[in-house]
Amino acid sequence: MAFLLHQARFYTTVNHLRDLPPTVQPEIAFAGRSNAGKSTAINVLCNQKRLAFASKTPGRTQHINYFSVGPAAEPVANLVDLPGYGYAEVPGAAKAHWEMLLSSYLATRSQLCGLILMMDSRRPLTDLDRRMIEWFAPTGKPIHTLLTKCDKLTRQESINALRNTQKGLDAYRDQGVKGKLTVQLFSALKRTGLDEAHELIESWLRPSVADAEGAPVAQ
């Protein structure tokens, strides 16, 4: 079958939780540090050049961007591009706004069926990456990590990054986290890991898509 993600288009932008769309379709959120390559990864996954825009000033994008997936008349899911985090020059008020927006969305959005977490393969599992995991993990829903820009690593460095990140994620299971925590190497430039990421994301959506039509509208 054709990749579901290739049928993605811009839907809406929100800056406050009260403005989140009252949709019933399942959602997959994409999160990551500024400069982790999140926008580029979304574009490659969706086979489009300019679906997700990267701000010229890292860390300045403060909105949640929604992209609908599936037929335009009857979309079956939404991809949710969350604001990048961790850029040092962002004002404190903006950081506080992002923290509230991200933590509340991840913890309470009932339509959310999984989180794709982008980490630069050269610097995985930063303190802020761990904070994202800790906000979302209590929901019991899966988190899949893309170790981006792996083309910048040697083969052995890639192996080490993958092993060490998986070890770090396994520690959360030892602490009682119930949701699946998985990781893979990914390069938008070389298209490394693209098929693996497609298959995993669509596996999250398929059972949810089957149930979405009869689900109640959630705020």
UniProtKB/Swiss-Prot annotation:
Superkingdom field: Bacteria
Binding positions for GTP per the UniProt entry: 32-39, 59-63, 81-84, 148-151, 186-188
Keywords: Cell cycle, Cell division, GTP-binding, Magnesium, Metal-binding, Nucleotide-binding, Septation
InterPro entries linked: G_ENGB_dom, GTP-bd, GTP-bd_ribosome_bio_YsxC, P-loop_NTPase
BP GO annotations: division septum assembly
Listed GO CC annotations: cytosol
Residues holding Mg(2+): S39, T61
Domain named EngB-type G: residues: 24-207
Family: Belongs to the TRAFAC class TrmE-Era-EngA-EngB-Septin-like GTPase superfamily. EngB GTPase family.
Protein name: Probable GTP-binding protein EngB
Originating species: Burkholderia vietnamiensis (strain G4 / LMG 22486)
Highest classification ranks of the organism: Bacteria, Pseudomonadati, Pseudomonadota, Betaproteobacteria, Burkholderiales
Gene label: engB
